[in-house]
Amino acid sequence: MKPLLLYLPLFALLFSGCCAKSKQELVACGEDKVFILDFESSTEGQPNIIWSWAASEATDLPDVYRTKYLIPFDECKPVDSSTKILLTSSGGGIVLLDRATKKSLFYAYCPMAHSAEMLPNNRIAVANSTHPEGNSLEIYDIDTPEKVIFKDSLYSGHGVVWMYKHKLLFALGFDDLRAYSLKNWDSDSPELALERKWLIPSEGGHDLTRISDNELIVTAHENSWVFSIADETFSVFEPLANVHNVKSINYNPLTGQLVYTKAETNWWTNNIYCENPEKVLHFPEIKLYKTRLSQ
């Protein structure tokens, strides 16, 4: 028994390491800044920022990105197990940023970009809002910066989410929600094929978020709704019923955890609102726009 007893501390260490709960992180952006907080240890009086980056640090990009295209940030999606952050800006830029090195892995000029999503085959979908060159849904290849490989019209594009189970890309515009399939995706000339389109219950579509394999949350000027893909129906998202101008939303239907931002001063806010657990994270020096949860 003695040899076995010698290994017990090692077994315990390995077991505890395997079973340790990963820390929940919160990515937020506004103005020319993006930062990551440790969610559990952040309080209203002292948000615990563990990582940050600013457009001025993008020295590996053309100067116009640092001074114009990346100001202000309006999307900050953690992707690839949170090793990268997909950023968009209404100033006209998109960047895929490596978290560890803070190097740009992809960039493009996207007029009034408001959201983006990773797609199969190392491609990116971008929703562009109101701009003479915008109002569109664009597709890019990560290996080819600043080259649009497909484009469709989408008035006031604000959200894009890839639903893997359904093999559909959902896109949110001013007053409609669309579902696209991937066409000729393994070729050099990929396309999106519009499969379905639904009018949303209120104008001013803003955020689009996946909450399960079969459901999305849509936010707009007047309210937020859960969209059932199977039933093709919208139902009011009760935790935020009648809350106007929700700019970003994160929700776990299993735990009830809810994290969101809403416009409180023009289009921006100084607060991130959290429920289950309940707290308000306050940032008096930053005009915040969106926040995204990651593990």
Show the residue positions of the predicted features.
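Bacterial Sec-dependent N-terminal signal peptides
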Residues: M1-K23
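Repeated scaffold domains used in trafficking and secretory/extracellular systems
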Residues: V64-K77, C110-L119, L154-W162, I200-I211, ...
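Residue-level detector of Asp-centered blade-edge/turn motifs that repeat once per structural unit
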Residues: S22, V79-S82, L119-N121, Y164-H166, ...
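Hydrophobic beta-strand positions that form the internal "hydrophobic ladder"
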Residues: L26, I85, I124-A125, L169, ...
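Short, solvent-exposed loop/turn segments at conserved positions within beta-propeller repeat blades
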Residues: L87-S90, S129-N135
